[in-house]
């Protein structure tokens, strides 16, 4: 009894000390040290004091007026909670478990103190009635944040059912939707060092999770789901952003599981399960004659189940720019339509799109260890531009058959590249290439290879280099000696076929075809 009384008195004394020092940050630092020293002698008090000390960084939305019944509008309470948490380092804005909070569209804006977390353990629901929706294309927007975490074991539900029913109709056998007013569920803009993990996102009126102009983002363990026929309900969309790492996500929606738009680079996707949906899409790129750039996308270990597309690159006619250094490997297709698809004639118009000569250049695309079943006869479709052909297309150990077990087909148009290992079905325009090991080495920077094809120069003084965008020149070299074998450096910023289409003899600055 005496020991318990003494412990209680000691704890009360500590509380008084904490209150007295609360206004002095330097005193607080010294106090923390004193508390730690004292608590080493009493473990039970240490646990209690630390629980209260840590609780000071948690901002529970209920404490700021939010009502967890799913009916009362908690928008203002969420905004107030954010404003308080934003000012404190390592703060946690908590949406508690076993509660449902109704929130209208809201912007959570920074900059904030570092290590801020928005932790959703309960459920957040949107306004389900389009007629009552406030004028905004985004439901929950996060902007101008650094070192920010959006996480939790809870659910963010866009309640998009009424939006889908009222905004779409079938025209000439195609579903056409009015997307002008349908909101995106979550958008993160102009932010760095962001982590999004473990949440369940569902039933967004339109896209579920969109990133714009972000850098250094990790997405892990998300579950994103919407009905197969829900229109334009992309899982994750990335625009004008770089350095993304996406892993261990399960996505099934009515549109792209993951879409990568222009201005994006260094995107890694690992251990993805996709389906239903439209697969992983790069694009669409080059719409309305615009310039587009996407580079260094790596997909490793993915499974596509009953998807409308698998690995898709889509560009509009009339655009310009470059999509390059794209690698897909270790992918399984299960009854997926269009498992491998490059479509440079992408068109969503109800009528046919006009043919145009310019196009986004597609270079250096690798498909490695892709296997499974296709729901469409053409398991591989490489439909490249007539005026700007695809170059550096590389297929290694690809085996796809129809779900019925019958052979599938490959349709390739203006696709230049090679295959190695197994290729089922065969593609008529691809030629045999290097071994898988050589194939891997080619992708590395400053790789040196022996080559003596396709160029010539005067006498023995020969300098050969690769040209990333040489003009069309069909004149063969005349009156010159064949070039001696040279060491060719394959640069990562100049994607080429293993046997490049054109060479430069720099001693007299002429370009030749092999």
From Swiss-Prot:
The family classification in the record reads: Belongs to the glycosyl hydrolase 28 family.
Q: Which residues are glycosylated?
A: 266, 397
Supply the name of the protein.
Polygalacturonase
The UniProt record lists the EC number as 3.2.1.15
> Where in or outside the cell?
Secreted; Secreted, Cell wall
Higher taxonomy = Eukaryota, Viridiplantae, Streptophyta, Embryophyta, Tracheophyta
- Gene3D superfamilies per record: Single-stranded right-handed beta-helix, Pectin lyase-like
Q: Spell out the GO cellular component terms annotated for this protein, sorted alphabetically and separated by semicolons.
A: extracellular region
Q: Name the propeptide positions.
A: 23-50
Record field: catalytic activity = (1,4-alpha-D-galacturonosyl)n+m + H2O = (1,4-alpha-D-galacturonosyl)n + (1,4-alpha-D-galacturonosyl)m
Q: Where are the PbH1 repeats?
A: 214-240, 241-262, 264-284, 294-315, 323-344, 357-384
Locate the active site: 255, 278
């Amino acid at each position: 009894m005496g020991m318990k009384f003494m412990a209680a008195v000691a704890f009360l004394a500590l509380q008084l000390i904490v209150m007295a020092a609360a206004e002095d940050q330097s005193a607080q630092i010294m106090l923390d040290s004193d508390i730690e020293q004292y608590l080493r002698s009493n473990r039970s008090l240490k646990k209690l004091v630390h629980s209260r000390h840590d609780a000071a960084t948690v901002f529970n939305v209920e404490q700021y007026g939010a009502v967890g019944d799913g009916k009362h509008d908690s928008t203002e309470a969420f905004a107030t909670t954010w404003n308080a948490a934003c000012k404190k380092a390592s703060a946690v804005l908590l949406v508690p478990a076993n509660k449902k909070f109704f929130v209208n569209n809201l912007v959570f804006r920074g900059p904030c103190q570092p290590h801020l977390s928005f932790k959703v353990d309960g459920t957040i629901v949107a306004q389900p009635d389009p007629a009552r929706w406030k004028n905004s294309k985004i439901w929950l927007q996060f902007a101008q944040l650094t070192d920010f975490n959006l996480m939790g074991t809870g659910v963010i539900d866009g309640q998009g059912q009424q939006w889908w029913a009222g905004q779409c109709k079938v025209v000439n056998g195609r579903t056409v939707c009015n997307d002008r007013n349908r909101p995106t569920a979550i958008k993160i803009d102009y932010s760095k060092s962001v982590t999004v993990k473990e949440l369940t996102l569902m039933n967004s009126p339109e896209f579920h999770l969109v990133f714009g102009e972000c850098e250094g983002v990790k997405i892990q363990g998300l579950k994103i789901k919407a009905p197969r026929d829900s229109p334009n309900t992309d899982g994750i969309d990335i625009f004008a952003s770089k350095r993304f790492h996406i892993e261990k996500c399960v996505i099934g929606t009515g549109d792209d599981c993951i879409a990568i738009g222009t201005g994006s680079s260094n995107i890694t996707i690992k251990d993805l399960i996709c389906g239903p949906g439209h697969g992983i899409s790069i694009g669409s790129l080059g719409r309305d004659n615009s310039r587009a750039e996407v580079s260094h996308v790596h997909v490793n270990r993915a499974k596509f189940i009953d998807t409308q597309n698998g690995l898709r690159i889509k560009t509009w006619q009339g655009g310009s720019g470059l999509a390059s250094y794209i690698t897909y490997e270790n992918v399984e297709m299960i009854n997926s339509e269009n498992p491998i698809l490059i479509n440079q004639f992408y068109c969503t118009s109800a009528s046919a799109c006009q043919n145009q000569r310019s196009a986004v250049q597609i270079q250096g695309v690798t498909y490695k260890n892709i296997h499974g079943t296709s729901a469409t006869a053409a398991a591989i479709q490489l439909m490249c531009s007539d005026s700007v052909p695809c170059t550096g297309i590389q297929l290694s150990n690809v085996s796809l058959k129809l779900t019925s077990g019958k052979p599938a087909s490959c349709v390739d148009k203006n696709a230049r590249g090679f295959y190695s290992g197994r290729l089922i079905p065969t593609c008529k325009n691809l030629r045999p290439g290097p071994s898988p090991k050589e194939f891997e080495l080619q992708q590395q920077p400053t790789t040196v290879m022996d080559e003596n094809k396709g160029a010539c120069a005067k006498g023995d003084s020969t300098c050969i280099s690769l040209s990333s965008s040489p003009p069309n020149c069909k004149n063969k070299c005349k009156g010159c000696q064949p070039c001696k074998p040279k060491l060719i450096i394959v640069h990562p910023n100049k994607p080429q076929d293993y046997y490049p289409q054109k060479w430069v003899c720099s001693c007299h600055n002429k370009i030749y075809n092999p």
